Amino acid sequence: MIFNKVIERISILKNRCRSSECSIIGVLFRMLMFRLVYKKNILTSPKVKIKNIKNIKFNKNSNLIVGLSNVNHVNNNSICYINNRGEMHVSGNVFIAKSVRVDIADSSKIILNDCYIGPETDLISYSGISIGKGSMVSWRVQFLDEDFHLVSYNDKKPKDGKITIGENCLIGNNVAINKGCIIADGCVVASHSVVNGVFLEKNCLIAGVPARVIKRNISWQH
């Protein structure tokens, strides 16, 4: 039984490596290095660069798989870069596709829970980003929890920069998720939307520039 599971996992990994045009030997070597040196369950292609691996925290039986998804419109030679100056917390199986860029500031934390991050997505965090269980992020999505440039005006209210994506959400391609956004469980954000607000109602379709709720009581399938 155990032998059959091992063979099945090797077969899945072999297919992933073939579709990503990378050597299974190189992938296995990196996996062993992460296990032996850092005690981390990380599986990556050779085109992945991770700084400060020690700052990645894993819950029990959790795995981080980076750069091994088959995405036809993304060059297999593109680099996936994770600059982890703060903390990254991984729960369940977290998949990060090719050409994703992650930058976590010293004071920040990114929490990824059994989710998928699509190719060419940027997660730039100076306050905190949390993506819930079962959520999927499409390609070229930008998460940005910091303004970088101060704009002052009368009656300006302070705003918590943290971004929270609930469970089982779908974020469409080319969406901008900005500082202070909260998206409730089961919501779908339509492609090319710009999300600036707080959406606490579950199972809504959110769309537009700026984004607003356009449908309620929706459902979607993986």
From Swiss-Prot:
InterPro entries: Hexapep, Hexapeptide_acetyltransf, Trimer_LpxA-like_sf. This is Uncharacterized 24.8 kDa protein in cps region. SUPFAM superfamilies: Trimeric LpxA-like enzymes (SSF51161). It comes from the Bacteria. PANTHER family: LIPOPOLYSACCHARIDE BIOSYNTHESIS O-ACETYL TRANSFERASE WBBJ-RELATED, SIALIC ACID SYNTHASE-RELATED. It comes from Klebsiella pneumoniae. Gene3D superfamilies: Hexapeptide repeat proteins.
